[in-house]
């Protein structure tokens, strides 16, 4: 089966590579000529465990190709996936200009039936706009060519995307015709054979499902952070509370971890977009507005704990603060909306010297903020002469540090754990002053 995927960002490249690995012939398209040149030279522009090897494997097998020219591949494909960016506008709504540009290009060059599938996260009603954009171009050409639009939102977790794609909890597909359903069933046949759930529904429901799923997960995070902050005030332990409520099968144990706020390319953007969609339709999403407020506040919690430990914000001036973790989560270099960016600004504004280490995201941080902080060679280098250590990202290598070595390296034995990964008793035995979230 021949398919095209427009957009070689995170979603497009992972999806295209994984489809190729199931046996499809995939052409990935991007208007960025430099990115396509890099891909054709075997350079992967994003970090995702296992992706480099999988791209090389499928390129070598002849199932995965890269080009800048969408028009040149339309005659040969049955499906065109649109996986381009939908950045938020200033008002929080999703900007569809790239999605609609793809539709326009398809309309300008279409010669036979295809299914045009939106994989980007888009508001309800986008498929109608895609259909109209294609029809407008066909009308300008004076031709009538049958096509279908569909929605197939992605549910990939950065750092675990290949496994998520190849072994999904579910595949959601929104279609408007039996023909489109038949074509997409053929594409997803390898998943059906392996008994993975492919759920077909109408297009508006598929578009809503992605926003609803991410907003539900964001809600669980903010709820637990709210509970954690209350636990600190009443003498409860949020870890015990999590165990107590997570054992209820109606609630479950996942996404019940307190911390220093969520970030990334999805949750913040999707919550804002769903709030905006509701506003545009005369409804106010009060729960999600609270979720957003709680998260923004939570990103400052570690700084507030640091100020409290030193007595005042003025007392932070000239202090050296070690930071472990820069990416918004482990196994990625993505720093979009990361708590680390908020923390760095607050620390620098307070006159602190920041020494940071992250296994993957150092280059990305330098690209974003330059040399305003010190980038350290490892986790132990970061704590050298530090007055405090802040843990922001729960990378595996941070979970069992040598506290004896760290204590000797630091000026003050102060640890503030933003992800609750350290053992309280172990730190107390090593005579550290330890603060975490929710106890």
Question: What are these regions, as identified by a protein language model?
Answer:
Residues 1-439:
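Structural/interface elements that position substrates and couple domains in central-metabolism enzymes
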């Amino acid at each position: 089966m021949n398919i095209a995927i427009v957009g070689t960002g995170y979603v497009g490249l992972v999806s295209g590579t994984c489809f190729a690995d199931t046996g499809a012939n995939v052409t990935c398209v991007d208007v960025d000529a430099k990115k396509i040149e890099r891909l054709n030279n075997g350079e992967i522009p994003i970090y995702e465990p296992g992706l480099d090897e999988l791209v090389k494997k499928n390129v070598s097998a002849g199932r995965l190709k890269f080009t800048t020219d969408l028009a040149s591949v339309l005659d040969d494909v049955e499906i065109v996936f649109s996986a381009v960016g939908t950045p938020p506008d200033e008002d929080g709504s999703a900007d569809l200009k790239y999605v609609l540009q793809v539709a326009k290009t398809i309309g300008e060059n279409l010669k036979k039936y295809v299914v045009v599938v939106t994989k980007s996260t888009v508001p309800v009603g986008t498929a109608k706009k895609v259909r109209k954009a294609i029809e407008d171009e066909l009308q300008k050409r004076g031709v009538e060519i049958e096509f279908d639009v569909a929605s197939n939102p992605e549910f990939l977790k950065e750092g675990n995307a290949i496994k998520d794609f190849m072994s999904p909890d579910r595949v959601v597909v929104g279609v408007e015709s039996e023909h489109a359903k038949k074509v997409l069933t053929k594409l997803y046949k390898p998943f059906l054979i392996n008994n993975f759930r492919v759920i077909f529904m109408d297009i508006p429901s598929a578009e809503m499902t992605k926003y609803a799923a991410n907003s539900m997960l964001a809600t669980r995070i903010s709820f637990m952070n709210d509970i954690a902050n209350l636990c600190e005030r009443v003498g409860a332990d949020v870890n015990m509370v999590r165990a107590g409520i997570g054992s209820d099968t109606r609630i479950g144990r996942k996404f019940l971890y307190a911390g220093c706020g969520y970030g990334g390319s999805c949750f913040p953007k999707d919550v804002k977009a769903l709030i905006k969609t509701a506003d545009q339709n005369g409804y106010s999403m009060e729960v999600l507005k609270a979720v957003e407020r709680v998260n923004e506040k939570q990103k400052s919690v570690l700084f507030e704990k640091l100020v409290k430990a030193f007595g005042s914000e003025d007392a932070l001036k000239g202090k050296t603060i070690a930071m472990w973790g820069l990416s918004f989560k482990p196994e990625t270099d993505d720093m979009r909306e990361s708590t680390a960016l908020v923390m760095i600004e607050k620390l620098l504004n307070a006159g602190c010297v920041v020494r940071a280490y992250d296994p993957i995201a150092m280059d990305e941080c330098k690209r974003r903020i330059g040399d305003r902080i010190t980038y350290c060679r490892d986790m132990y280098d970061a704590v050298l002469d530090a007055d405090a250590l802040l843990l922001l990202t729960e990378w595996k290598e941070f979970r069992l540090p040598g506290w004896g070595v760290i204590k000797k390296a630091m000026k003050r034995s102060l640890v503030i754990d933003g992800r609750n990964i350290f053992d309280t008793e172990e730190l107390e035995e090593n005579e550290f002053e330890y603060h975490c979230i929710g106890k």
